UniProtKB/Swiss-Prot annotation:
GO terms for biological process: protein import into peroxisome membrane. Pfam families: Peroxin-3. This is Peroxisomal biogenesis factor 3. Identified in all tissues analyzed, with the strongest expression in liver and in testis. It comes from Mus musculus.
Length: 372
């Protein structure tokens, strides 16, 4: 039996060697294929876990954004009410002064300015914080993902985070003061000559707000016979590059350098077309909500209905400007409310804001960011 098998192998030596080689190759390829499949499965599982972890961190970061916006609204409201103190004028009117008409004119400008600035600054706060917290959130995610790895440097240590996020104070301080000045000039130009007895409908108010926005956002007109150069709304949210940290040519710590890098990345975002589009969408929604809030005061009376005026017409009811002023003056408490109001909720829940936040977070939470 063994001899016959040996003779068979001798007669078919080449064929047996070939067959053995083929079978051995198939076995090795099978093992190699199994190893590669296992590696692919492990890599896909790791990527899935990393993506799920990043998604969870992103969603948590958005909740932090929302809570931060709400927590800062009282500070914004207080700063506005301090700079545009209409309450003191209202108190003066109750004392029946001799310059009553002059006080009413001041109240007209301050009331409209305050509500318009409230809309602008709240929209800016919502979008700016989305940018800042998603940039820093991306860095924090990368820090957490690389913790424990040899040779890794923390991208955003707590002291850098604090220094970077403190830049929001520009919007609540000098930036807000500049914004108040610009908007007050625009309001004076559009409404300064409008008589207190002149009646305006909701449609008229909408048109006046549009005219004021054009002056504020495009700066294509001149005030007080002086040319006003074009500028973006970015200047109210971030100081110029030459100020505080960036102006120091020497003595910068590693923390300062990292903070400047974060601020420059933020400025790049603020100057991008996407940011401009999102902020403009927020402003459109904000002013629309402002008009909605005032619409309830323009409801037709029974007498109007008897005369056949349409309930849905924006021009069916008109009020003297003197009666509109208190309505406008009180809008700051709705716009800058720390309790989730329709105004703030509308801004926080806008799909454009969510998508923009996701894009910012995606850009700063990828491993490629480590190579920069």
């Amino acid at each position: 039996m063994l001899r016959s098998m040996w003779n068979f192998l001798k007669r078919h030596k080449k064929k047996c060697i070939f067959l053995g080689t083929v079978l051995g190759g198939v076995y090795i390829l099978g093992k190699y294929g199994q190893k590669k499949i296992r590696e692919i499965q492990e890599r896909e599982a790791a990527e899935y876990i990393a993506q799920a972890r990043r998604q969870y961190h992103f969603e948590s970061n958005q909740r932090t954004c929302n809570m931060t916006v709400l927590s800062m609204l009282p500070t914004l409201r207080e700063a506005l009410m301090q700079q545009l103190n209409s309450e003191s004028l209202t108190a003066l009117l109750k004392s029946r002064p001799s310059n009553k008409l002059e006080i009413w004119e001041d109240l007209k400008i301050i009331s409209f300015t305050r509500s318009i600035v409230a809309v602008y600054s709240t929209c800016m706060l919502v979008v700016l914080l989305r940018v800042q917290l998603n940039i820093i959130g991306g860095y924090i995610y990368l820090d957490n993902a690389t913790v424990g790895k040899n040779g890794t440097t923390v991208l955003a240590p707590p002291d850098v985070q604090q220094q970077y996020l403190s830049s929001i104070q520009h919007l609540l301080g000098d930036g807000l003061t500049e914004l108040v000045t610009v908007i007050k000039q625009a309001v004076q130009r559009i409404l300064g000559s409008v008589s207190l007895k002149h009646s305006l409908s909701l449609l008229d108010l909408e048109q006046k707000l549009k005219e004021i926005r054009i002056l504020v956002e495009q700066h294509q007109s001149s005030w007080n016979d002086k040319d006003v150069s074009r500028s973006s709304l970015c200047q109210y949210m971030m100081p110029d590059e030459e100020t505080p940290l960036a102006a120091q040519a020497y003595g910068l710590s590693h923390r300062d350098i990292t903070t400047i890098k974060l601020l420059n990345e933020t400025r790049d975002m603020l100057e991008s077309p996407d940011f401009s589009t999102v902020l403009n969408t927020c402003l459109n929604r904000g002013f629309s909500r402002l008009l909605d809030n005032m619409a309830e005061f323009f409801r037709p009376t029974e007498q109007d209905l008897q005369h056949g005026n349409s309930i849905n017409s924006l021009s069916s009811v008109s009020l003297p400007l003197a009666k509109i002023i208190p309505i406008v003056n009180g809008q700051i408490h709705s716009v800058c409310s720390e309790t989730p109001s329709h105004f703030v909720q509308d801004l926080l829940m806008m799909e454009q804001v969510k998508d923009f936040a996701a894009n910012v977070y995606e850009a700063f939470s990828t491993p490629q960011q480590l190579e920069k």
